[in-house]
């Protein structure tokens, strides 16, 4: 695991997240009353009106967790894995893709779950629940998205040998493309598309990382395509002839 950073770096990460957790526990509190709900931050009230405190908190924290977990997994593993898959020997590239992605995901899993400690503490202080089911699902979906984005980023890094930054950029752009194409899944037939065309588009969309929380990430079509699709494409990319980075 030293390939993904020193133990000192992980210790600093843990201490930073624990410090933020302490701030959250001391400074933030939620209140729900007959007149509405409010959040107290260092004793200063932030009124939320008549909104349910629980629905307000969970609605916002789900999106935060989905983004934070996926980005931490991606950024925590991409650099070392992309360097491993840039090896001159084909066997080493394939090993780097499969073994490196697995180790990178494990490293990102550790970093992301440590990063969520302040979020769990915030949920507990605001609504009295540390691990509500809605946030647990958002955490799991974020891990799946992070793995999917990591696979796509490594694939792009292999194809775009000149720039790892471009590989990350294309991965993030690809994540934003999926929700836009989902419009045609809902209204494609109303626009004159045939059922087969909509089905082909659905398969393509399933391959892409999604910038919004999915409703059925474990369906028989979704999971094999979202993870297996970029994994197969990445493995094929590792078979391409080696080329030096510019």
Where are these regions (language model features)?
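Terminal transmembrane helical anchor/hairpin motif
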Residues: 27-59, 168-246
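Membrane-interacting alpha-helical segments
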Residues: 1, 5, 133, 137, ...
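Transmembrane alpha-helical segments in integral membrane proteins
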Residues: 66-85, 154-166, 227-246
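Aromatic- and glycine-rich beta-strand/loop motifs that create alpha-glucan
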Residues: 1-19
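Membrane-interface helix-boundary signature
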Residues: 6-9, 58, 62, 134, ...
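Central hydrophobic cores of alpha-helical transmembrane segments
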Residues: 13-21, 163-177
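Helix-loop-helix units of permease transmembrane domains in multi-pass membrane transporters
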Residues: 75-108
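Secretory targeting signals
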Residues: 22-33, 38-73, 100-169
């Amino acid at each position: 695991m030293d390939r993904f950073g020193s133990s000192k770096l992980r210790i600093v990460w843990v201490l930073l997240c624990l410090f933020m957790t302490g701030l959250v526990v001391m400074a933030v509190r939620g209140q729900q009353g007959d007149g509405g709900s409010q959040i107290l931050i260092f004793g200063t009230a932030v009124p939320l009106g008549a909104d349910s405190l629980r629905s307000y908190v969970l609605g916002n924290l789900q999106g935060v967790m989905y983004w934070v977990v996926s980005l931490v997994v991606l950024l925590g593993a991409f650099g070392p894995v992309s360097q491993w898959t840039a090896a001159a020997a084909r066997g080493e590239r394939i090993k780097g893709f499969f073994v490196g992605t697995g180790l990178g995901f494990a490293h990102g899993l550790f970093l992301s779950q440590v990063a969520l400690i302040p979020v769990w503490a915030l949920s507990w202080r605001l609504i009295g629940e540390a691990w509500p089911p809605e946030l647990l699902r958002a955490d799991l979906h974020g891990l799946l998205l992070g793995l999917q984005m990591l696979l796509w980023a490594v694939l792009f890094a292999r194809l775009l040998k000149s720039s790892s930054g471009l590989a990350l950029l294309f991965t993030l752009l690809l994540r934003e493309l999926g929700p836009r194409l989902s419009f045609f899944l809902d209204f494609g037939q109303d626009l004159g598309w045939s059922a087969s065309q909509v089905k082909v588009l659905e398969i393509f969309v399933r391959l892409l990382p999604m910038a919004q929380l999915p409703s059925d990430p474990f369906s028989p079509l979704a999971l094999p395509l979202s993870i297996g699709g970029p994994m197969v494409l990445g493995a094929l990319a590792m078979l391409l002839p080696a080329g030096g980075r510019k």
